[in-house]
């Protein structure tokens, strides 16, 4: 997600109406130095992140990490893993909370995949795994060649399915916003 000062946000009708810039100059400098990514979190942003965490904890959503991301004003929050349907709900709660708490801190939270041209975009996704009802992780490679058999078989099946059903996967996941982000 990106955080921008609310006063600056309100000066941009394109941000207000679309959640991203539609015109304007490219950034004067790219992301070559990683100064934002490896920099310390500014106090205002840290206070925002703290308040977001408090609100999320109240509704049972815990985040594993939060940090600066590569692009200027870009940040990340990663919720703790959960079953897919719960994780999707958590993502929705997180996005609503980010927007609400940003307003309380005099900022706007941009959740568009690519709010600014010339810098990294943001992605919202759910990781997945395959676990049996007994709790066995089917994607655990194990530590011995014998333990690798199950992992290799499952991985081979996944790769075969992705190769065979590539068009269906693309149709179910591609959209203009995601293509623009990449």
Annotate the PLM regions.
Residues 2-111, 116-182:
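Glycine-rich, acidic/polar active-site loops that bind/position phosphate-bearing ligands
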């Amino acid at each position: 997600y990106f955080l921008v000062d609310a006063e600056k946000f309100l000066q941009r009708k394109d941000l207000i109406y679309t959640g991203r810039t539609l015109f304007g100059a490219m950034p004067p400098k790219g992301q070559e130095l990683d100064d934002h990514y490896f920099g310390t979190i500014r106090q205002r942003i840290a206070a925002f992140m703290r308040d977001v965490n408090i609100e999320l904890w109240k509704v049972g959503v815990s985040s594993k990490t939060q940090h600066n991301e590569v692009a200027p004003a870009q940040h990340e929050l990663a919720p703790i893993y959960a079953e897919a349907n719960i994780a999707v709900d958590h993502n929705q709660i997180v996005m609503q909370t980010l927007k609400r708490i940003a307003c309380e801190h005099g900022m706007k939270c941009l959740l568009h995949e690519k709010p600014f041209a010339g810098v990294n975009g943001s992605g919202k996704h759910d990781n997945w795994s395959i676990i049996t009802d007994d709790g066995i992780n089917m994607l655990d490679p194990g530590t011995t060649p014998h333990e690798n058999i199950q992992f290799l078989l499952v991985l081979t099946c996944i790769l075969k399915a992705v190769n065979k059903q590539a068009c269906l996967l693309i149709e179910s996941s591609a959209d203009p916003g995601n293509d623009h982000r990449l």
